[in-house]
Amino acid sequence: GLLGFVGSLLGGLGI
């Protein structure tokens, strides 16, 4: 999500 790590799973905004 955010930068392509855990954020991707929660946010889904990035890689």
Curated annotation (Swiss-Prot):
Disulfide pairs here are none
| Keyword Secreted appears in the UniProt entry | yes
Q: Does the keyword Secreted apply?
A: yes
What is the role of this chain?
Caeridins show neither neuropeptide activity nor antibiotic activity.
User: What is the protein's name according to its record?
Assistant: Caeridin-6
Question: Which keywords fit this entry according to its UniProt record?
Answer: Amidation, Amphibian defense peptide, Secreted
Q: In which tissues is it expressed?
A: Expressed by the skin parotoid and/or rostral glands.
- In-chain residues carrying the UniProt-annotated modification Isoleucine amide: I15
UniProt subcellular location: Secreted
What are the recorded Gene Ontology BP terms? defense response
A single Gene Ontology CC annotation of this entry is: extracellular region
